């Protein structure tokens, strides 16, 4: 018999006994004795540790954290030492039935109607799946993300060029998994409020609201987080779902449905192609190490649930940066991976030290600042955040306006087909969205562009 495996099995039985017990030391001790077939001296130490860690001897408080309790018991020195004593060696003699329950939801949810998903069966039924099918989609059996031919791979991959050079990997879920992620987003995640400094991926907030609070400031500091989505590990996503009241087993499945391990072949092929373009065979080890985070479970950029999950998992980052900003007398907002700070001349004078503190806080929360994208913009320069000019008031960049104006003019003169150079499936809606965004920043210019948009003859 392997003691660690046996210890885990017995610890689960003890956890069930405590979950079924009233919150009373004597009755909890009686339940443990029934589970083990006899009382034991080392149970006193275990009970004391449980009370100190979970704030209860038994009952609802422990039932809601049943799996965490089992893991805690399995690691207690007094429990493990008992395996070495032939007279006190634990074994299970009695079994208590246990029905997992949802934990208490955070008060911040304001009584929102979260789905009650206490078991894997509940989650499977909610997603209209069988339990084995749920395991398949959640990647429960996956331990190696290396093979593209892996039958549990529910993603397709697309490389797109970044605006400033390099390539970005989009990990796009296939249809059925995407539908599940969308339901998790719509019926669970949208109820959870992010930090007030976060302006991306939430209702009534936008790139404009992110930028507007920084208008008319003497100094604006723009910073960027490198690889924002992949920097959010699965353990942080699991902790979020657990904090929402989902039992550990359900939180684990929800995490599996929303996180992904990139097959190494995807990255190997891209690095080999890049090396070939540069005229040498193979690829260097440093480039491979730069992609190491993709080989662990992370939020995939391309999944509908990832932006909101990343926002929520960055909550503590926002708390710390907002506190830093308040202490320094500056304003802070975040739009996805874009950080913005603004204030008076004092911010410019102390900017080097301020940047170091921001980078240290980000590193402590698992993120890295991209130093090449850090810019201090004074009032005498063009101050721009997420495409919005904020020198005096939120406004559109003149070159953005002129570029869109030229596209609309060419569409009206030569037809829209030749202007859709990116092959967008709904070019008309794309242009309408750009015009509407510009109109929010500059109504007069927006009205002129709206007239140009209306003059385009669209094919039936």
Residue spans of the language-model regions?
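Short, hydrophobic/amphipathic alpha-helical packing segments
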Residues: 117, 181, 314-318
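Short amphipathic alpha-helical segments at helix boundaries and their inter-helical linkers
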Residues: 56-59, 142-159, 258-272
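Conserved polymerase palm-domain catalytic core
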Residues: 215-335, 340-361, 365-368, 374-377, ...
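A conserved non-catalytic segment of reverse transcriptases
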Residues: 361-414
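Nucleic-acid processing machinery
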Residues: 106, 110-111, 117, 148-161
């Amino acid at each position: 018999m392997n003691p660690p495996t046996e210890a885990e099995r017995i610890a689960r039985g003890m956890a069930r006994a405590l979950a079924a017990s009233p919150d009373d030391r004597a009755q909890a001790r009686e339940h443990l004795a029934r589970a083990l077939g006899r009382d034991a001296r080392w149970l006193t130490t275990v009970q004391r540790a449980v009370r100190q860690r979970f704030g209860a001897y038994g009952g609802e408080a422990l039932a809601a954290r049943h799996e965490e309790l089992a893991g805690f018991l399995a690691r207690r020195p007094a429990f493990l030492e008992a395996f070495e004593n032939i007279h006190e060696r634990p074994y299970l003699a009695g079994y208590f039935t246990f029905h997992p329950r949802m934990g208490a939801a955070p008060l911040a949810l304001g009584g929102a109607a979260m789905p009650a998903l206490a078991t894997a069966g509940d989650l499977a039924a909610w997603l209209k799946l069988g339990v084995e099918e749920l395991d398949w989609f959640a990647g429960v059996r996956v331990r190696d993300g290396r093979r593209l031919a892996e039958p549990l791979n529910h993603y397709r991959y697309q490389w797109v060029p970044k605006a400033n050079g390099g390539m970005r990997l989009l990990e796009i879920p296939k249809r059925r998994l995407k539908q599940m992620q969308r339901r998790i987003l719509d019926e669970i995640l949208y109820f959870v409020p992010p930090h007030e400094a976060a302006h991306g991926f939430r209702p009534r907030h936008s790139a404009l609201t992110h930028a507007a609070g920084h208008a008319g400031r003497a100094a604006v500091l723009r910073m960027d987080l490198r690889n924002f989505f992949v920097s959010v590990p699965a353990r942080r996503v699991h902790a979020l779902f657990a904090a929402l009241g989902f039992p550990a087993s359900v939180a684990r499945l929800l995490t599996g449905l929303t996180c992904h391990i990139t097959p190494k072949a995807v990255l190997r092929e891209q690095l080999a192609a890049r090396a070939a373009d540069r005229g040498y065979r193979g690829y260097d080890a440093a480039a491979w190490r730069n992609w190491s985070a993709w080989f662990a479970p992370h939020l995939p950029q391309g999944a509908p649930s990832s932006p909101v999950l990343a926002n929520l998992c960055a909550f503590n980052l926002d708390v710390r940066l907002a506190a830093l900003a308040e202490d320094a007398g500056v304003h802070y907002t975040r739009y996805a991976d874009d950080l913005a700070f603004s204030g008076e001349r004092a911010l410019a004078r102390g900017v080097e030290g301020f940047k170091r503190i921001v980078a240290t806080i980000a590193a402590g929360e698992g993120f890295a600042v991209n130093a090449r994208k850090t810019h201090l913009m004074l009032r005498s320069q063009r101050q721009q955040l997420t495409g919005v000019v904020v020198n005096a008031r939120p406004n559109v960049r003149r070159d953005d306006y002129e570029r869109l104006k030229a596209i609309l003019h060419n569409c009206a003169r030569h037809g829209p087909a030749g202007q859709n150079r990116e092959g967008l499936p709904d070019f008309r809606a794309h242009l309408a969205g750009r015009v509407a965004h510009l109109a929010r920043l500059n109504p007069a210019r927006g009205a002129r562009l709206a007239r140009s948009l209306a003059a385009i003859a669209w094919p039936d």
